UniProtKB/Swiss-Prot annotation:
This is Membrane progestin receptor alpha. The lineage of its organism: Eukaryota, Metazoa, Chordata, Craniata, Vertebrata. Belongs to the ADIPOR family. It comes from the Eukaryota. GO terms for molecular function: nuclear steroid receptor activity; steroid binding. It is a multi-pass membrane protein. The gene is PAQR7. Keywords: Cell membrane, Developmental protein, Differentiation, Lipid-binding, Membrane, Oogenesis, Receptor, Steroid-binding, Transmembrane, Transmembrane helix. Residues 1-80, 127-139, 187-239, 300-318 are cytoplasmic. It is found in: Cell membrane.
Length: 350
């Protein structure tokens, strides 16, 4: 009897296995989203950051998936991505209150919002996708620098148009916007060149930081002059507080950008959170938001001041804006081609 039962079970088990097959191991294992610094080329290394790097030469889908993974660029991506979404919301509010089509004095306001959204979006994209390969690392950060140049000119235009005092306008009206366009392009070129030559010493910092410092000094001069010339307390000028905030936030952002703080104090402890570049992003976002509030208040409240100043333009600011965008994109493209040749040559000599 027992033998007959065993024989029946032996015939039944194969059929059960066919109905309920055993789970097979996945042909495509879950990808590894982060690796140690030793597993990526030195080009991708960050000072004092030893883990949290993403592997190279994965699919584009892989890098887009890392938007929702922990790695050492995640905070950099999200700070500027969320800020870009906030700017879209702010633009929607502006569209409901500002006549961008009918009011000729509203165009600089639209340009500064567009420029801010551009630099935030390109920055988020660069930090998200730069780990694809050496070539794309260079190319996306070149594009990031284009966004910075666009934002620099947009800021200069908004300050010159809405925030400037008549006394300072009389001194700089013929040179301000052409110089702002040139310095924005020079800042983009210097940053791209510094990235290309990969010299961390004095030469590299000079190429990147000196043009940017000169551009900021010119761009913020209408605001600085107004702050210094205004009586204290300026209760009748609510935009002035936002202008002061944007200056403070920018200086803090510049300090964290240059000093690699606090990761230099806690090496190996700031892989995901607490990097100086992340704090640079946060303070730059705060600077941009404070700036937009100040410019919006100036657009509404200072019309009797700025309308007479801009009845006749010595320069076409829309043309200068497009020139800044076009020249910066061209510079980034040309340097990306130099990078391609350099990488191809390195592969041939290996």
């Amino acid at each position: 009897m027992a033998t007959m039962v065993a024989q029946k079970l032996s015939h039944l088990l194969p059929s059960l296995r066919q109905v309920h097959p055993e789970p097979q191991p996945s042909v495509h294992p879950e990808p590894v989203f982060t690796v140690d610094r030793a597993e990526v080329p030195p080009l991708f290394w960050k000072p004092y950051i030893y883990v949290g790097y993403r592997p190279l030469h994965q699919t584009w889908r892989f890098y887009f998936r890392t938007l929702f993974q922990q790695h050492n660029e995640a905070v950099n991506v999200w700070t500027h991505l969320l800020a870009a979404l906030v700017l879209l919301l702010r633009l929607a509010i502006f569209v409901g209150t500002v006549d961008f089509w009918g009011d000729p004095h509203a165009l600089p306001l639209f340009i500064i919002v567009l420029a801010s959204f551009t630099y935030l979006s390109l920055s988020a994209l660069a930090h998200l996708l730069q780990a694809k390969s050496e070539f794309w690392h260079y190319s996306f950060f070149f594009l990031d620098y284009v966004g910075v140049a666009v934002y620099q000119f947009g800021s200069a235009l908004a300050h010159f148009y809405y925030a400037i005092e008549p006394a300072w306008h009389a001194q700089v009206q013929t040179i301000f916007l052409p110089m702002a366009a040139f310095l924005a392009w020079l800042s983009c070129t210097g940053s791209c060149y510094n990235k290309y030559i990969q010299k961390p010493g004095l030469l590299g910092r000079t190429c990147q930081e000196v043009p940017s410092a000169l551009a900021y000094a010119l761009d913020i001069s209408p605001v600085a002059h107004r702050i210094l010339a205004s009586p204290e307390p300026a209760t009748d000028d609510p935009a002035l507080l936002y202008h002061k905030c944007q200056v403070v936030f920018f200086l803090l952002a510049a300090a964290f950008f240059s000093a690699f703080m606090p990761e230099r104090w806690f090496p190996g402890s700031c892989h995901i959170f607490g990097q100086g570049h992340q704090l640079f992003h946060v303070f730059l976002v705060l600077c941009t938001l404070a700036q937009l509030e100040a410019v919006a208040l100036d657009y509404e409240a200072r019309r009797p001041i700025y309308e007479p100043l801009h009845t006749r333009w010595p320069h076409n600011f829309s043309g200068l804006f497009l020139l800044t965008v076009g020249s910066s994109i061209l510079t980034a493209f040309l340097l990306s081609q130099l990078v391609r040749r350099k990488l191809d040559l390195d592969r041939k000599t290996q």
